[in-house]
Amino acid sequence: MRAWVIKEIGELNPRNFYLSEVEEPVIALNEILIKVFVCGVCHTELDEIEGRAKPSFLPIIPGHQIVGEVVAIGECVNKFQIGDLAGAGWIYSTCGKCAFCKRGLENLCPEFKGTGKDAQGGYAEYFKIREDFAFKLPHGKKPEKLAPLFCAGGIGYRALKLSGLKNGEILGLIGFGASNHLVLKIAKVLYPDSPVFVFARNPNQRLLALSLGADKAFDIEEEPEEYPQALIDTTPVWRPPFYLLKYIKPGGRLVINAIRKEDLDKEFLLNLSYERDLWHEREIKTVANITRQDIEEFLMLVDKAQIEPEFEICPFERAFEALEDLKNQKIKGAKVLKIN
């Protein structure tokens, strides 16, 4: 089968990330084989290629926002039948036995495996996964509208839950790409009286935010007239969230939704002032991975509220260009690879 492969760690280039012919996955007990229709593009793929979130092994097929058709089932599979529409996200497997798993925090399991990082992912014509970590989807939905829900949407939803926001309080979103544009749409449903402010350096992202219902849009270093109770950051760098930290109301929270941060502007942390930026019981929280419950809840919410992502379709053969666009912030909403 055809698949995009990360061969080695380094700057994004055709030598370490390329389209190749690889063996089709062979399913085992409790596993299903999915013919991949589409796979969402995520900044995590860049983090893997460039070494900030190193894969467990190389070469590896990245990609973790997968939608396709079940074409084979292993022994003891009960949840799926051949022909079903199925999806998979970042959570590939967990141990199911540790204290975190038993408490409903499987995202913190020490044996957590990320799809496309610790197991072969979805930038491929076929993908396999255990049935209990796959999600059955209704026929009739366009796969390209579903793919971004499995990471950008699901983890954005988890970030929103972790923000502790209450209806009527101001929510601030830092960066406005695949995840935060969906957070905006979710927040407008769950917290209808909460103004949503978007902070983005790119003026096109600010215009998009306003067109999708944001109450106000600011440049990254622009002071808002009113201060938010919570900020959700999806940028890959340090400066934006920690510059804006001083504008969070007392008792408020910054939630960082990123698997890693780049080192380019790490020295900005030296500018932090305890009194100005951290005092008054402000909190900083990070999002680590995702649970199946997050994805299930989010899919139900999206279906009920008729939320759809903004997305651009990219041919499978142009995955390299899609990641280049993401790296250079030339993207509107989410980007989705069309494979089969």
Model-derived regions, located:
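NAD(P)H dinucleotide-binding glycine-rich loop of Rossmann-like/cofactor-binding domains
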Residues: 94-174
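Glycine-rich beta-strand-centered segment in the early N-terminal region that forms part
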Residues: 23-39, 52-99, 133, 138-140
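Mid-domain Rossmann-like dinucleotide-binding core that forms the NAD(H)/NADP(H) cofactor-binding site
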Residues: 139-221
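A short acidic, Gly/Pro-enriched loop at the edge of an enzyme's catalytic core
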Residues: 223-231
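C-terminal hydrophobic helical "lid"/dimerization subdomain
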Residues: 200, 292-340
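Glycine-rich phosphate-binding loop and adjacent beta-alpha segment
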Residues: 238-308, 339-340
